[in-house]
């Protein structure tokens, strides 16, 4: 078969945002109605290729060096020398998608540091229902084969259907990355390729935590346990988690980069992700021993201590039980005692699929809510509580807890009643941005109790003074540079505000905040309503204007008694040059043109006496505000000082408008000069007053025809 080149067409920029919002409203993004990633429709593409007798080649993730990586696996790397992209049909005469069902031994690590991902895939094979949510049925290298396959992944709140071709990186006729112990089986290699596609390259998968894979295969939420301070009932927690299909992974921390994948005396690998695949209590010489089953994604290098493959402890176990536990040699899977597990490993990750309350003795479905947000320099990226001047500008979300948890049958009055909930903060698309030198930011969140005087109020973004005088009630266990930070809380009924942030201010990123509660709870994103509290503007007739001002105007305007754009620029720059305390490069011709257009009521492109009088009074007012909020007296305002100044001037704006304002009016260092400040406030005030004039029925809605819209936007 020839190869078929099909270039996908999909929306970008603003049109993509509009399309995404419409898709959500239509229910797209649920697993049963997954979004077609990059607009690629698996069935349409497959049929298209079959009709033309051509094998699919994916130009959205082509078989080229850039798809391998950008640094260690970049186009000029020695590690990629000799790599050839080949289809399984070129490697084997009888390639198979899945042989005798998917099993843990189908996943063996190759020359890529994505053991965390492979540990997650291995855990996925323990639950056939979960597996086939990710790996759809009906795919093969025989019936209907067209060189195209697809997989479904959870990506930041929505399920996407990802199409790949079956051209895989090989060297000397063997797969370079993940492969199956069953040589001619390819589902795991193709799933790895789909995951590499959504993250931009294979190299982007290097290094990570198993929880990432867990969540992207299930849409669940992961909890972490530091084994040095684990709860006393952790083994029971593990048993329950495995029983209800949760995915589990564990690892050994490293103290230095030299320890990475170092092998211990008893053949455990440091800094390496293992999957937990089973747990069992066995009778050993009359005593019950807790065992735990692990798997190394390498497919080899196994624990050699007590209860390892072939160890003497197995001789003391009933032969039937020994056979049930299927002790095998060198398949990467092994048993060890839970006591040794606690001593040898550092961290355990459990991905709750529902999620369920693992600390409870019975299953409980949690109520879930998901919010998407952004951190933007100068507007919504305020950093953590260590930065009180900017912390308040971070996005804020309110939680209203009303119903307390059901009584715990194992609790004998030792705990006060409270409301359990779990918060999970996830940063988006950071792996995909690695090729641009960006990696995971250090993230976390704080939870504040709303004081009685503010309870029940509509969405109001809490300001700086609140956080200066109130301590957090709870917070994430740590700020850490992982994709997700999650923490379980139990707080009394009441209203609380969650503030997610990066550790340092001005670190940009997109995030998802997920909220899970055992009982129903109200949640909402806090954002100020857009409004302006402006005094009635006194518009004087020419006769009422002060004679001294008239005299000044005659000198400035010249014979035609009107001020042009160039004349306005000369006037304003002459004035501000006398104020040595102001940092400014002067008003540009474009900014003066914008002011004239906004203030020009008769449409002649110039300002008459009355129009100039209005502008003059506004600028004098803006100058006093500017000086008031130039807190460090630097001659300019920071983006955050400007936000307070705008509010003092009478404007309440939401996060999106502040983002736009900072993007348009601040310098690269986020400083706002006086001229930009004036241009911003002139525009805001004029547009608010203009809208108020048109909103005759005071319903907050104005309808424009195309001509009016163009007229407004062209002159704004």
Swiss-Prot record:
Pfam families: Calpain_III (PF01067), EF-hand_8 (PF13833), Peptidase_C2 (PF00648)
An annotated Gene Ontology molecular function: peptidase activity
Binding-site residues for Ca(2+) 4, renumbered to this chain: 630, 632, 634, 636, 641
Region: Domain IV, residue numbers: 545-715
Co-factor binding details: Binds 4 Ca(2+) ions.
PTM entry text: Undergoes calcium-induced successive autoproteolytic cleavages that generate a membrane-bound 78 kDa active form and an intracellular 75 kDa active form. Calpastatin reduces with high efficiency the transition from 78 kDa to 75 kDa calpain forms.
Region ranges (Domain III): 355-528
Region (Linker): 529-544
Primary location: cytoplasm
Catalytic reactions of this protein: Broad endopeptidase specificity
Chain positions recorded as Ca(2+) 2 binding sites: 318, 323
Keywords linked to the UniProt accession: Autocatalytic cleavage, Calcium, Cell membrane, Cytoplasm, Hydrolase, Membrane, Metal-binding, Phosphoprotein, Protease, Repeat, Thiol protease
Function: Calcium-regulated non-lysosomal thiol-protease which catalyzes limited proteolysis of substrates involved in cytoskeletal remodeling and signal transduction. Proteolytically cleaves CTBP1. Cleaves and activates caspase-7 (CASP7).
Protein's UniProt name: Calpain-1 catalytic subunit
